[in-house]
């Protein structure tokens, strides 16, 4: 069992109080039953998250909408689990959804995991969305330095020359300068 799955199962076991329904959802192999949890009324949040996560890991695209909602949740562990499952779901809609969440100024406080997801996806939408998000975070006194740092790191990981101007701008910000130097070092030199 990998670390993200272990963390999720422990957290949701605590939320559920270790009830029998939790054990059943954690062990069932019936994907239709898990999908039903996402659409039927009356299921607690922990059950919906567990069902969406398990469907995502199984590559069942019925989990997509629920996972995107969890990616935009105010609780960071839910966001992290959703991002993990979305990478494994391999749905072509994921990058567009992550880009929309990362660039939404009204939800910037919750953009950290969508930004990290964009870097993990290496999708065509990733670099433009990370550039846009980072440009907005370079304003004076912006309170979202963790989002800005994740953008810098993601752009370095992606190594796209289009990121060079915004990464050069990030050098002027002490909290980002070291990461920007590393990111710029990962971008191939133009000839």
Where are these regions (language model features)?
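Boundary/linker segments of alpha-helical solenoid repeat arrays
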Residues: 109-111, 138-144, 175-184
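Amphipathic alpha-helical scaffolding segments comprising HEAT/armadillo-like alpha-solenoid repeats
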Residues: 2-7, 26-40, 60-72, 91-104, ...
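Core register positions within helices of long alpha-helical scaffolds
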Residues: 21-24, 54, 85-88, 117, ...
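Non-membrane alpha-helical segments in proteins
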Residues: 19-20, 45-57, 80-85
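Residue-level detector of extended alpha-helical repeat arrays and alpha-solenoid scaffolds
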Residues: 18, 48, 79, 111, ...
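Short inter-helical turns and helix N-cap capping residues of alpha-solenoid HEAT/ARM repeat scaffolds
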Residues: 42-44, 74-75, 106-107, 144, ...
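HEAT-repeat alpha-solenoid elements in large eukaryotic scaffold proteins
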Residues: 5-16
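Extended alpha-helical scaffolding segments
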Residues: 144-169
């Amino acid at each position: 069992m990998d670390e993200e799955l272990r963390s999720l199962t422990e957290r949701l076991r605590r939320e559920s109080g270790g009830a029998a329904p939790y054990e059943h959802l954690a062990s069932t192999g019936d994907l239709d039953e898990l999908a039903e949890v996402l659409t039927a009324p009356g299921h607690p949040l922990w059950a919906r998250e567990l069902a969406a996560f398990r469907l995502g890991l199984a590559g069942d695209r019925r989990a997509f909408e629920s996972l995107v909602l969890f990616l935009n949740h105010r609780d960071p562990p839910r966001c992290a689990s959703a991002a993990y499952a979305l990478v494994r779901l391999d749905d072509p809609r994921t990058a567009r959804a992550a880009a929309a969440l990362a660039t939404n100024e009204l939800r910037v406080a919750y953009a950290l995991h969508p930004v990290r997801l964009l870097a993990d996806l290496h999708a065509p939408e990733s670099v433009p969305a990370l550039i846009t998000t980072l440009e907005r975070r370079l304003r004076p006194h912006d309170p979202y330095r963790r989002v800005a740092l994740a953008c810098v790191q993601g752009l370095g990981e992606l190594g796209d020359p289009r990121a060079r101007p915004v990464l050069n701008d990030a050098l002027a910000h002490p909290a980002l300068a070291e990461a920007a130097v590393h990111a710029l070092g990962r971008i191939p030199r133009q000839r």
